[in-house]
Structure formats: C-alpha cells, structure tokens
C-alpha cells in the first residue's frame, strides 16, 4: 500500500488499468487510495500493520462472545463441549489454542476478533458484506499490533501462538489463573494457518479480549484508526480488488467461495 505514495505525490498519470471497469476514472481509484493512506499516516507505525473490514461503519471492534452477551461460564462450557466432541470428527487436537482457533473459524462465539495482514482482504470483506455499499457504509480498521501489545501487556511484539508460552488461553482466560492482560492482545496463529487453507489465504491474525469487553477502537488513534468507503470511492475500491485478485474464491478457497465467485462472474456478464 505504501508504494502508492509515489503515485500520489507525483503528477497525475493516465492509468490504462481503469479500462478494466467501464466508467471508472483515474480519480476514482486515487480518491480511494488517498483516504486509505491518510488513515495509515495517523498510526504510530512501530512495525506491522493489521486490517479488519466491516460492513457497517457503526459497528465496534468487539468479538462474538461479547457481542452476544455470553458469560464466562458459557464460554468455558462451549470450550469443554468443543474439545470433547471434536475428537469424534477429526484426530485428537492437543493444543488449546488450535481448539480456540477452530471454534472461531466455524462460528462459535469466542473472545477472538479476526484481523488480516492483507489490506486487500479487509477491503474485500467490507465491500462484499455491505453489498458494495448498497446496504450500509463499509469501514476498514487499521491496527498497529505491536503498539497495542505494548500498551496492554508491556511487550512490544506480537505473540506467536502456540509457540509462545507467555499466554495460556485455558489458564489465563478460562480458569483465571495468573494475570489477565488489561485489554485486547494481538496474537498470530503461526502454525494453525499451515493446516488451514482459508486462514492462510486470508492472512488471518487475531486480537484476544479480556473480560472487560472493551472494543479495540477504544484504544488511542495512534494504535487503531479507520476510514469509511463512501459511495464515491466504491468504484475505485472495486477496481483495487480486481487488480489485487481478491474475490470470494481467493478469500474462501472452498466450494462456498467458488460458488460465490461464479455467481459474481455470471452477474457481471449479464450486465
């Protein structure tokens, strides 16, 4: 994304790539990129940058467990039931974190919030689930995970899970043993993505939240910021996705994603 600065700081070029979308002008894609770069500029930029696309600009950055009002006792029951029954479906999984990642992956409310290391994937999520701005105004959040962890744990790094033994999901968050970080913590499921194609394609990472239920967007704007994709920027954002080869199938590399990709292809051909 930052390579686009060179384009924005120089004279306005004529971009033949806009011919891929009828009616999309150079100004449309540059308008979208300028908004994104302006949001990036407000971060502390201590190292990595993560993204999250949401269909509705009014939604907070809360994980499913706190959006649904589930209690800690229900979380423990759900985890226990998952670990017991999951062994009947696949080979036994010994790692506590991989159980949690699988629960999140398949839609069980957890204290995890999904993020991605791919700007294009975040833009894709926000546009697709807002019907490209027709049902709501999409928003893309931008997070400095190292700055977040510095604030909530005192450690200026992302925790690589499960290799990093500093944090235990079961002991710290379920059983209440030890000291729970005050606020969300950025974690990377380093080995989990190797066995999960969807998580790998989405460049998936997470924040794990404490019992306060505080949303990530309550953090200072030097740690997390955002921008909305307004109606006038939608054409430029759609072209950006096309150039980035982001579609339903690249995000969801399974039969459901393939079906969504083909539906979109047929819809475009019928216009």
Label each PLM-derived region with a short phrase.
Residues 8-271:
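Catalytic-core elements of nucleic-acid end-processing and repair enzymes
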């Amino acid at each position: 994304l930052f390579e686009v600065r060179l384009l924005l700081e120089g004279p306005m070029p004529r971009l033949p790539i806009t011919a891929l979308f009828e009616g999309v002008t150079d100004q449309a894609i540059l308008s979208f990129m300028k908004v994104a770069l302006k949001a990036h500029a407000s971060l502390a930029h201590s190292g990595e940058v993560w993204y999250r696309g949401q269909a509705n600009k009014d939604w907070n950055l809360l994980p499913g467990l706190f959006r649904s009002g589930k209690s800690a006792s229900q979380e423990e029951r759900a985890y226990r039931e998952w670990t017991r029954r999951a062994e009947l479906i696949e080979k036994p999984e010994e790692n506590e974190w991989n159980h949690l990642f699988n629960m999140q992956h398949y839609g069980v409310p957890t204290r995890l919030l999904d993020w991605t290391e791919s700007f294009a994937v975040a833009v894709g999520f926000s546009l697709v689930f807002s019907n490209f701005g027709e049902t709501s105004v999409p928003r893309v959040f931008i997070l400095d995970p190292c700055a977040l962890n510095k604030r909530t744990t005192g450690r200026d790094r992302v925790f690589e899970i499960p290799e990093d033994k500093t944090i235990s999901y079961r002991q710290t968050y379920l059983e209440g043993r030890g000291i729970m970080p005050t606020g969300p913590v950025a974690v990377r499921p380093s080995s989990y993505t190797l066995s999960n194609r969807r998580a790998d394609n989405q460049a998936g990472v997470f924040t794990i939240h404490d019992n306060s239920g505080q949303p990530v967007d309550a953090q200072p704007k030097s740690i997390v910021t955002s921008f909305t994709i307004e109606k006038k920027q939608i054409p430029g954002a759609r072209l950006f996705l096309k150039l980035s080869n982001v579609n339903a199938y690249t995000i969801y590399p399974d039969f459901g994603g393939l079906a969504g990709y083909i539906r979109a292809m047929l819809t475009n051909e019928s216009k």
